[in-house]
């Protein structure tokens, strides 16, 4: 009998019952909530007269709609100018109080982007099933978790039953061996993967990321990669547990202590695919060949190394891709064969659940130190992923590096990743962004998004256009 993959092990450990149609009822260990996908779920509980099944499994924080300017933030919820955004944040606050759910509120130092806060607090632990009403919940798979996003009706179901009906995915292994070169980051790795397999390449699969590159990668780097599994078409992305995982979790607020810690570690050390496990699909990349990446179009798969030019229609593989590229040229205001360095940038955004952790901010600061934002850049902003990340960065003096260079140093939140708060692009503006999505209008109506790493974004802010960070 063949061995099990990590995904198989996590799935089997959480099956409550198998249904006649082949789907399974899974037990959910951790449920993270935010203000956008939870209001109707809480209303459903109220109308049915139900209470959350296991209060301690649920933790909430507002992130999508919160303002990141200090002036607005100091006013708390009342400082949110947009009525809909303010109502959503207030409703989360009210619901958490009504149901006695722990919430890291808008002015709590622990508040932040839910996918930064969960691991930071030790709410995310190896071996857990983790769900949240947000597609980038795959982030938590970096800890050897089975983590994925859910819809609002499923949020209600988890609140009420602590279980969820799911159909099992197939197994895919993405193996990246070799050693990353100078200036090549986890963000470049995942963009290169998406560039290779496309945004539908992982559809129907749970992706395990393996190989030397991921073994060498930090936990925060693994979070960046797993975060974008959804952009590769998969709901689930994960990395096996190792000593780095255990060391990261140790001592965090919600991590087990004493004898419970020892028992947990013994289990966590089993969370890897068996040597004889069989995957349904295997994708391989040579990490040594990966360069810093820049997305040029309106899909994460429209990505190229910084050394390349915008592709021409002759390079498209079929008519569908030719049509997609033609529309992307028009929307992005680019020409086939245009050099990336010729794209005039308007704004730079360093933040989001993909790249707003302390390592990301350090990487950007290393590039920025002693330099100035180019006069042609209208706005360059750093948005830490949580209050604690912001606090740590300020302790290290990183905020001063950015402020002296001409960056804005913001309060934590989702910010310019998506057009649901005050941080938006104007029509026609090009933005070097460390976020995860670049479809039409993602950062604001008519806004043009280019996905890059924090180091590449920082270099672009200084140069005023894309430049190979390896030359800095």
From Swiss-Prot:
Protein name per Swiss-Prot or TrEMBL: 3-isopropylmalate dehydratase large subunit
Family annotation (SUPFAM superfamilies): Aconitase iron-sulfur domain
Substrates-to-products reaction catalysed: (2R,3S)-3-isopropylmalate = (2S)-2-isopropylmalate
Self-association and partners: Heterodimer of LeuC and LeuD.
Role summary: Catalyzes the isomerization between 2-isopropylmalate and 3-isopropylmalate, via the formation of 2-isopropylmaleate.
Keywords: 4Fe-4S, Amino-acid biosynthesis, Branched-chain amino acid biosynthesis, Iron, Iron-sulfur, Leucine biosynthesis, Lyase, Metal-binding
Organism: Acinetobacter baumannii (strain ATCC 17978 / DSM 105126 / CIP 53.77 / LMG 1025 / NCDC KC755 / 5377)
Superkingdom of the organism of origin: Bacteria
Gene3D superfamilies noted in UniProt: Aconitase, domain 3 (3.30.499.10)
Cofactor: [4Fe-4S] cluster
Keyword Transcription carried by entry: no
Cofactor detail note: Binds 1 [4Fe-4S] cluster per subunit.
Family: Belongs to the aconitase/IPM isomerase family. LeuC type 1 subfamily.
């Amino acid at each position: 009998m063949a061995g099990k993959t990590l995904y198989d092990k996590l799935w089997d450990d959480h099956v409550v019952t198998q249904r006649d149609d082949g789907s399974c009822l899974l037990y959910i260990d951790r449920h993270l909530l935010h203000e956008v996908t939870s209001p109707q779920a809480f209303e459903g509980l109220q109308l049915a007269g139900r209470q959350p099944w296991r209060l301690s499994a649920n933790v909430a924080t507002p992130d999508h709609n919160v303002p990141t300017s200090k002036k607005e933030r100091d006013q708390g919820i009342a400082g949110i100018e947009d009525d809909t955004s303010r109502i959503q944040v207030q409703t989360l606050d009210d619901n958490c109080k009504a149901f006695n759910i722990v919430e890291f509120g808008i002015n709590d130092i622990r508040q932040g982007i839910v996918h930064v806060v969960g691991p930071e607090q030790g709410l995310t632990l190896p071996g857990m099933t983790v769900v949240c009403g947000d597609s980038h919940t795959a982030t938590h798979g970096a800890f050897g978790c089975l983590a994925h996003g859910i819809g609002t009706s499923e949020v209600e179901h988890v609140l009420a039953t602590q279980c969820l009906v799911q159909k099992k995915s197939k197994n895919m292994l993405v193996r990246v061996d070799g050693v990353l070169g100078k200036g090549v980051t986890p963000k470049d790795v995942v963009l290169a993967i998406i560039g290779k397999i496309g945004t539908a390449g992982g559809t129907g699969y749970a992706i395990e990321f393996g190989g030397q590159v991921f073994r060498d990668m930090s936990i925060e780097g693994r979070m960046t990669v797993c975060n974008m599994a959804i952009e590769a078409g998969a709901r689930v992305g994960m990395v096996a547990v190792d000593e780095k995982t255990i060391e990261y979790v140790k001592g965090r607020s919600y991590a087990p202590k004493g004898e419970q810690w020892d028992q947990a570690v013994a289990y966590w050390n089993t969370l890897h695919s068996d040597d004889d496990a069989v995957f349904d699909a295997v994708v391989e990349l040579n990490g040594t060949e990966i360069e810093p990446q820049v997305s040029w179009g309106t899909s994460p798969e429209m990505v190229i190394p910084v050394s390349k030019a915008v592709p021409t229609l002759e390079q498209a593989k079929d008519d569908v891709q030719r049509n997609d590229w033609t529309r992307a040229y028009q929307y992005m205001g680019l020409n086939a064969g245009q050099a990336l360095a010729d794209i005039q940038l308007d704004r730079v955004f360093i933040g989001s659940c993909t790249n707003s952790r302390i390592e990301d901010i350090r990487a950007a600061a290393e590039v920025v130190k002693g330099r100035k934002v180019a006069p042609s850049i209208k706005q360059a902003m750093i948005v830490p992923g949580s209050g604690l990340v912001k606090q740590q960065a300020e302790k290290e003096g990183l905020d001063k590096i950015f402020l002296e260079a001409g960056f804005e140093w913001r309060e934590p939140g989702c910010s310019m990743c998506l057009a649901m708060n005050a941080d938006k692009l104007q029509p026609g503006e090009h933005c070097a962004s460390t976020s995860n999505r670049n479809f039409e209008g993602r950062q604001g109506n008519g806004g043009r998004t280019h996905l890059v790493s924090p180091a590449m974004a920082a270099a672009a802010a200084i140069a005023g256009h894309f430049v190979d960070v390896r030359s800095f």
